[in-house]
Swiss-Prot record:
Enzyme Commission identifier(s): 5.4.2.7
Organism this protein belongs to: Edwardsiella ictaluri (strain 93-146)
Enzyme class: isomerase
Sequence positions that bind Mn(2+) 2: 306, 311, 359
Cofactor: Mn(2+)
Gene: deoB
Domain of life: Bacteria
Family, per entry: Belongs to the phosphopentomutase family.
Entry keyword Zinc: no
Pathway assigned to this chain's UniProt record: Carbohydrate degradation; 2-deoxy-D-ribose 1-phosphate degradation; D-glyceraldehyde 3-phosphate and acetaldehyde from 2-deoxy-alpha-D-ribose 1-phosphate: step 1/2
Protein name, UniProt field: Phosphopentomutase
Coiled coil region boundaries: none
UniProt remark on cofactor binding: Binds 2 manganese ions.
């Protein structure tokens, strides 16, 4: 029985990519800088001491980071007995965004350039804004700028609740984000507005990767909180991913947990499981692993590393979340059967010690575990697509156009 379990620790980079300088990210190192802060007592909020990741270390995380950066992460166990295969991968795709990283993991790198809204103020074309106001019957809009999602809620949340005007904002990624209060504006109305925005962006040829619904609750600045009802409206991958090939060629199953289905625009997904928070995502993953049959991929995105800690530049929070994941990892390893493979990886970096609030261009870890997987180094991989090619070969699918099998 063949089953693959793919876990994306969203934004968990392990050192600057070769082309990091062209992204303004030379020197970025999500894992390394978190580990250094912990070792120096600079991340003792809600946790204490050096970064403690014994189970990820057994899968080769520290050694993969050493290969990536030439430095072993401070505080991690250099003498851990490694029970898995480990390496690191470069990104071939043109961007450092979520769809690019995930599509490339599934064998389809993004070799075109996304469209972006470059202006930090008055970010969106007036014609687009006017059309959205008219089609969605809006009283107007707020924002129209680059911003961190949490900052803009404190700045404009109260005005939004009073006026009924949605908050439009973007970032360095190819995104059009819309924040609205779940109760005063309405969740379904927000989703409908996002559908309209997606349609207009498509028709206008803007080539924007995602429209993201950002619902929130609360009653005043400092008390607003984004909810788990986020919804991403992505464009479809430009070629069949290994997910779609598994469904088409083997009539297999692909179980999406978290935002995976949104990222792939539901293409190649046979079941969607919604969960919010690391523990809930972990619980849902374990449940699906227990019931997975032959020719099944269980694919989980642990978004909190990125959304709650990376973008918010919360080093201690990121460290605590990694330690929580690590504590629960033995539960996952125990469910890996004789012919299964478990792959732990990331989609980009988001160094919480870095300037700004955007992603960082980094290598990703590639940690592979299974009773039939030979422990040892997988070395440097030229593309995230090596993961997709490896999974395609494992299931006996037609080869992907990009990537080399790792074993």
């Amino acid at each position: 029985m063949k089953r693959a379990f793919i876990m994306v620790l969203d934004s968990f980079g392990i050192g600057e990519a070769k082309d990091a300088k062209s992204f303004g990210d030379e020197g970025a190192d999500t894992l390394g800088h978190i580990a250094r802060a912990c070792a120096r007592g600079e991340a003792d909020i809600g946790r204490q001491g050096p970064l403690h990741l014994p189970n990820l270390s057994r899968l080769g995380l520290g050694k993969a980071a050493l290969e990536s950066t030439g430095r072993f992460p401070e505080g991690l166990d250099e003498n851990a007995e490694v029970i898995g295969a480990y390496g690191y991968a470069n990104e071939l795709s043109s961007g450092k965004d979520t769809p690019s990283g995930h599509w490339e993991i599934a064998g389809v790198p993004v070799l075109f350039d996304w469209g972006y809204f470059h202006e930090h103020q008055n970010s969106f074309p007036q014609a687009l804004l006017d059309t959205l106001v008219e089609r969605a019957n809006l009283p107007g809009y707020l924002g129209n700028c680059h911003s961190s999602g949490t900052v803009i809620l404190d700045q404009l949340g109260e005005e939004h609740m009073k006026s009924g005007k949605p908050i439009f904002y973007t970032s360095a990624d190819s995104v059009f984000q819309i924040a609205c209060h779940e109760e005063t504006f309405g969740l379904e109305r927000l989703y409908e507005l996002c559908e309209i925005a997606r349609d207009e962006l498509n028709k206008g040829g803007y080539n924007i990767g995602r429209v993201i619904a950002r619902p929130f609750v609360g009653d005043k600045a400092g008390h607003f909180q984004r909810t788990g009802n986020r919804h991403d409206l992505a464009v479809e991958p430009p070629a069949p991913t290994m997910l779609k090939k598994l469904v088409d060629e083997k009539q297999g199953d692909v179980v999406s947990i978290g935002k995976i289905a949104d990222i792939y625009a539901n293409v190649g997904i046979t079941k969607k499981v919604k969960a919010t928070g690391i523990d809930a995502l972990f619980d849902a993953t374990l449940q699906e692993m227990r019931q997975a049959g032959n020719d099944t991929i269980v694919f989980t995105n642990f978004v909190d590393f990125d959304s709650s800690y990376g973008h918010r530049r919360d080093v201690a929070g990121y460290a605590a979340a990694l330690e929580l994941f690590d504590r629960r990892l033995p539960e996952m390893l125990a469910l890996v059967k004789e012919d299964d493979i478990l792959i732990l990886t990331a989609d980009h970096g988001c160094d919480p010690t870095w300037h700004g609030s955007d992603h960082t261009r980094e290598h990703i870890p590639v940690l592979v575990y299974g009773p039939k997987v030979k422990p040892g180094s997988l070395g440097e991989r030229d593309t995230f697509a090596d993961i997709g090619q490896t999974v395609a070969r494992y299931f006996g699918l037609s080869p992907m156009a990009y990537g080399k099998p790792m074993f």
